[in-house]
Amino acid sequence: MQWEVVIGLEIHTQLATQSKIFSGSATTFGSEPNTQASLVDLGMPGVLPVLNQEAVRMACMFGLAIDAEIGKRNVFARKNYFYPDLPKGYQISQMDLPIVGKGHLDIALEDGTIKRIGVTRAHLEEDAGKSLHEDFSGSTGIDLNRAGTPLLEIVSEPDMRSAKEAVAYVKAIHALVRYLGICDGNMAEGSLRCDCNVSIRPKGQTEFGTRCEIKNVNSFRFIERAINSEIQRQIDLIEDGGKVVQETRLYDPNKDETRSMRSKEEANDYRYFPDPDLLPVVIEDSFLDTIRAGLPELPPQKVERFQSQYGLSAYDANVLASSREQADYFEEVVKIGGDAKLAANWVMVELGSLLNKLGVEIDQAPVSAAQLGGMLLRIRDNTISGKIAKTVFEAMAAGEGDADSIIDSKGLKQVTDTGAIDKMLDEMLAANAEQVEQYRAADEAKRGKMFGFFVGQAMKASKGKANPGQVNQLLKAKLEG
């Protein structure tokens, strides 16, 4: 039987506010446990929550960016459940009247096509604290620094049909919230976490199968692996005569499998009711107009502009616009270096390889946009060849200065003097007289392969400094003359 996969995602995005959603406590990551928890965060009697307007503004920014309906009247609700790191015994969230309603986000698939993914809603809520198991023998520690950190939970429609589509959607959300500046997107620190709802159904069936939720997956790679593992588990289970049970599961990356965590709760299990300590929040049109006017250029618009303005392919434009920092870096290089396609190649390939090797983001790149742009100028004016440029790039990455100083100090300037190249070629051909005779006696097909040998010998003789274009032109004339 052929199976169709149905995937919906819930993405928990920590908003980059300076203080928590209902208290004035700081939200700095990595502070000593329980040093950023106020009486409000601790759920002490008699204290009252006060809504952080910046969290509301950031949620509205996201809603406008995905062309969503913004809830003009917002009500906060208590989501009741017991967990050791939830001091109040309930979480303040939104149920019936979320701040962001239906919207959509377009994702680029591997074949270059664009698919629209529906966003059901996005609502504001407070994060819980954190249980610490590894540092305590036979017991669990509770860190409430995270309790009360503002979250925007983004709920998608079940529109994805493969793990790769799901990853593309999460990457698009990740890029968007970073462009907007509402989340740092640091998945390792838990700033962006994903719950994956996965089900299967026979191909052609319209009714959904029983879904399982994989909780708190925190990397693109693990999202893909977790979903694929769960898909295979459900297929094997049904084909062996079993039945999928609706439940919450965890992904174990070491065993590459999901395991049962608990039965899946429904909304009525949490006994939602309006929080009596928080008045409804009314969002006025003037507030939204101000936010709309301040929105930055978003990834889809930037991709379109990169193609029209710089003549880049759709693939290159999507890669370069995948983060705001990378897009800004690329444009700064183009501003100095002039050639957009050359800049795109160096940013994506050479710089990308360097950043992967160092394990850092582009805002920590050891080669600045000004340095790279300056080096590309020297390629364009034939001061250095593309091959020598790699040596210059490595030296810049090692902190040896800008392109011009490295070229001068290492004597890397390209030889463009026709007389000097002509003399060098004569000496090289004289030293390889036998190969010259073989070349001249060969047919056209063999000559093509043999020509590369002479080019290699010429570049070796010049220590890579001879202008490759001039070498090719003069060499061809000499061999066929």
From Swiss-Prot:
Name of the gene encoding the protein in the UniProt record: gatB
InterPro entries: Asn/Gln-tRNA_amidoTrfase_suB/E (IPR017959), Asn/Gln-tRNA_Trfase_suB/E_cat (IPR006075), Asn/Gln_amidotransferase (IPR018027), Asn/Gln_tRNA_amidoTrase-B-like (IPR003789), GatB (IPR004413), GatB_C_1 (IPR042114), GatB_Yqey_C_2 (IPR023168), Gln-tRNA_amidoTrfase_suB_CS (IPR017958)
Disulfide bonds: none
UniProtKB keywords: ATP-binding, Ligase, Nucleotide-binding, Protein biosynthesis
E.C. no: 6.3.5.-
Regions crossing the membrane: none
Name of the protein: Aspartyl/glutamyl-tRNA(Asn/Gln) amidotransferase subunit B
Enzyme kind, highest EC tier: ligase
Record PROSITE patterns: GATB (PS01234)
Family: Belongs to the GatB/GatE family. GatB subfamily.
UniProt xrefs under HAMAP family: GatB
Coiled coil: none
NCBIfam families in the record: gatB, PRK05477.1-2, PRK05477.1-4, PRK05477.1-5
Purpose: Allows the formation of correctly charged Asn-tRNA(Asn) or Gln-tRNA(Gln) through the transamidation of misacylated Asp-tRNA(Asn) or Glu-tRNA(Gln) in organisms which lack either or both of asparaginyl-tRNA or glutaminyl-tRNA synthetases. The reaction takes place in the presence of glutamine and ATP through an activated phospho-Asp-tRNA(Asn) or phospho-Glu-tRNA(Gln).
Gene Ontology BP term (one): translation
Keyword Protein biosynthesis annotated: yes
Protein origin, superkingdom: Bacteria
Molecular function via GO: asparaginyl-tRNA synthase (glutamine-hydrolyzing) activity; ATP binding; glutaminyl-tRNA synthase (glutamine-hydrolyzing) activity
Catalytic activity line of the entry: L-glutamyl-tRNA(Gln) + L-glutamine + ATP + H2O = L-glutaminyl-tRNA(Gln) + L-glutamate + ADP + phosphate + H(+); L-aspartyl-tRNA(Asn) + L-glutamine + ATP + H2O = L-asparaginyl-tRNA(Asn) + L-glutamate + ADP + phosphate + 2 H(+)
